[in-house]
A protein has these predicted regions:
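Conserved beta-loop-alpha segment that forms the PLP phosphate-binding cup at the N-terminus of a helix
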Residues: 1-24, 32-35
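General beta-strand structural signal in soluble alpha/beta enzymes
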Residues: 1-3, 25, 47-49, 76, ...
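Active-site phosphate-binding strand-loop segment of PLP-dependent enzymes
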Residues: 39, 50-106
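Active-site C-terminal subdomain of aminotransferase-like
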Residues: 118, 123-205, 219
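Conserved PLP-binding catalytic core of the aspartate aminotransferase-like
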Residues: 214-245
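Conserved PLP-binding active-site segment of the aspartate aminotransferase-like
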Residues: 226-234, 250-280
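Conserved small/polar residues in nucleotide/adenosyl-binding loops
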Residues: 293-300
């Protein structure tokens, strides 16, 4: 358990694991790009693949990448909150550990930890209040950090003291315990949580695919279960939609400035009823005469 969020892990990962002086990074969105930029301060952070060419609306084919067999690790961000994408396959290179930022998808479904050298995540999406990060690290990767690595940036420091080298983020740890018990005792485990989350996402994606007013830009295969992005025909309509949605009780739907449009984050805590209510609102908004007027005008301009 670490104070701070996953952004601190962007530095801790290379400080602890970049023993060969280089690592491979797959950039599938904003946070994986930031992680690569931070790692470049400590060695060669090679971007071996990126989906920037299509504004991160897909995940690079992990089986078609030329990995460096001398890389200390391969780094990915497994779910991309801003762009609404998620990995469906994992890079697996013999002798090269996989490091994954799972901040926005941890505990949403089962994870085979044996495929990873390190999993880290900020807790604020599915685990606990903001202010803490958690790392799961394979034993053989520990203890190789240089002596110059700051004490609190060394994984072994906290591991040796059961995460209590200094005063730990007690409230976040306590809340994590409650959430884990809830997932096990009330939900019935991560297999059931996955079914619930996939059902929620299916409701929203099925609606988006069944009409013409709103549009989801992500390639179907890589659509995120946690973050559903969509746009209306024009940016001015996006702004108007978000304002009316807020008045109706649907808050924080505005998409990130890098993407625009809207984003519905449907993490574990969002009940199915919330997604159904959002779809009902989308249907009513889409059916407004003014919406169709804007849609037709946009189509006319597009074909001029």
């Amino acid at each position: 358990f670490f104070q701070g969020g996953a952004t601190q892990q962007f530095a801790m990962v290379p400080l602890n694991f970049m023993t060969t002086g280089k690592a491979d990074y797959i950039v599938s969105g904003n946070f994986s790009g930031l992680a690569a930029k931070e790692a470049a301060k400590f060695g060669e952070a090679k971007i071996v693949a990126s989906s920037k060419d299509k504004n991160f609306t897909y995940i690079p084919d992990v089986n078609a990448i030329d990995y460096d067999k001398d890389a200390s690790y391969i780094h990915i961000c497994q779910n991309n909150t801003i762009f609404g994408t998620q990995y469906v396959e994992l890079p697996q290179v013999e002798g090269v550990p996989l490091v994954a930022d799972m901040s926005s998808m941890i505990l949403s479904k089962p994870v085979d930890v044996s495929k990873y050298g390190c999993i880290y995540f900020g807790v604020q999406k599915n685990v606990a209040p903001a202010g803490m990060a958690i790392a799961i690290v394979r034993d053989d990767l520990l203890g190789h950090a240089a002596d110059t690595v700051p004490t609190m940036m060394n994984y072994t420091t906290l591991l040796a003291k059961d995460s209590m080298y200094n005063t730990p983020p007690c409230w976040c740890i306590y809340m994590t315990g409650l959430v884990l018990k809830y997932l096990e005792n009330d939900i019935g485990g991560l297999e059931n949580m996955q079914k619930i989350n996939e059902a929620k996402a299916r409701i929203l994606y099925d609606y988006l695919d069944g009409q013409e007013f709103f549009h989801n830009p992500v390639e179907h295969r890589y659509r995120s279960t946690m973050n559903v992005t969509f746009t209306s025909p024009a940016p001015d309509m996006d702004k108007k939609f978000c304002a009316e949605a807020a008045e109706a009780g649907f808050v924080n739907l505005k998409g990130h400035r890098l993407v625009g449009g809207m984003r519905a984050s449907i993490y574990n805590a969002m009940p199915k009823e919330g997604v159904v209510a959002l779809v009902d609102f989308l249907k009513k908004y889409e059916a407004k005469p003014v919406s169709y007027t804007h849609l037709r005008a946009h189509e006319t301009l597009r074909h001029l």
